[in-house]
Amino acid sequence: MSDLKMQRSGGEPLDTIKAYIALTKPRVIELLLVATIPTMLQAERGENNIVLILLTVFGGWMGAAAANTFNMVADSDIDQRMGRTRARPLVRHTVSNRDASIFAWVLTVASFLWLWLLCDSMLAGIFVLITIFFYIFVYTKWLKRRTHMNIVWGGAAGCMPVLVGWAVIVDQFEPGVPQQWWQAIVLFMVIFFWTPPHTWALAMKYREDYKAAGVPMLPVVRTPVQVTAQIVWYSVATVLTTFLLIPATGWIYAAIAVISGVTFLFMAIKLHLGIKNGGKVKPLKLFILSNNYLAVLFVALSVDAVLGLETIGEMLGWTTTFF
């Protein structure tokens, strides 16, 4: 009746609850909030259906929590070999793999039904199912352990909240109202291009962890100069993509997109030049900045949409339904 048995049983009820919460990776789910709410506000620009937004966020949260839990089950073998993941519930046996899998399946079904029945959008529910399938089978089980481009293509799963949010809003539109899916695609691509520099900056700090676990992240298989060069290129792509949305937004988003974008690029280039010139650099600074950059950008989009400001496209006389 050792401590190990108590550990495997999950200990006190509060500890078990904390373990299940940890399975969902709450910090990762922050991206869901950052992406979904501004996207929905932009889609309905000026309407601000708060109840529908909150319902969608909760439904999306269940889907993201399911994906993250499945991910922990699939990665439990390598998590025990990485210093920063050894305290995860499945490694410490506070939750069994079987119970975690059941938890993930319940969340998956609940998320789909929630979005379909309560948010009146089967399309949003289907997007969540696609996200979970892609994240587990394409990224976790296939790409992650086989290619240094894992996060580039696998990161597409993290972009899906914008499509979920947009789908819920446009499914409420009357027939004939332009759905303007191009805006959702732009926001999808912003997160798609943002994910690699964000992740690689963190992976540079934990390079030895990934190496020990046999995960071929770019910093493991390429030199720091090569890694930071890729970070710069993807940062450029991110910033340029944010500009594509300017015609459909007001001056607040436009100004923040330019100012924050220049700052993000400056820090990415500074990191690259610092390493290239043999200086002492801290990649984690770029990781933190990238988080703040995306948050500020989407907050600006939210404020712009809530205020219902005249769009740049309207200011320029572009009166087509495209904008």
Swiss-Prot record:
| PANTHER family to which the protein is assigned, alphabetical | 4-HYDROXYBENZOATE SOLANESYLTRANSFERASE (PTHR43448:SF7), PROTOHEME IX FARNESYLTRANSFERASE, MITOCHONDRIAL (PTHR43448)
Q: Which InterPro entries match?
A: Protohaem_IX_farnesylTrfase, UbiA_prenyltransferase, UbiA_sf
Reaction equation(s) it catalyzes: heme b + (2E,6E)-farnesyl diphosphate + H2O = Fe(II)-heme o + diphosphate
User: What is noted besides the main data?
Assistant: Carbon 2 of the heme B porphyrin ring is defined according to the Fischer nomenclature.
Residue ranges of coiled coil: none
Protein name (record): Protoheme IX farnesyltransferase
Q: Which GO terms describe its molecular function?
A: protoheme IX farnesyltransferase activity
Q: EC annotation?
A: 2.5.1.141
The UniProt gene name for this protein comes to ctaB
What species is this protein from?
Corynebacterium glutamicum (strain ATCC 13032 / DSM 20300 / JCM 1318 / BCRC 11384 / CCUG 27702 / LMG 3730 / NBRC 12168 / NCIMB 10025 / NRRL B-2784 / 534)
Q: In which pathway does it act?
A: Porphyrin-containing compound metabolism; heme O biosynthesis; heme O from protoheme: step 1/1
User: Which UniProt key words apply to this protein?
Assistant: Cell membrane, Heme biosynthesis, Membrane, Transferase, Transmembrane, Transmembrane helix
- Similarity section: Belongs to the UbiA prenyltransferase family. Protoheme IX farnesyltransferase subfamily.
- Enzymatic class: transferase
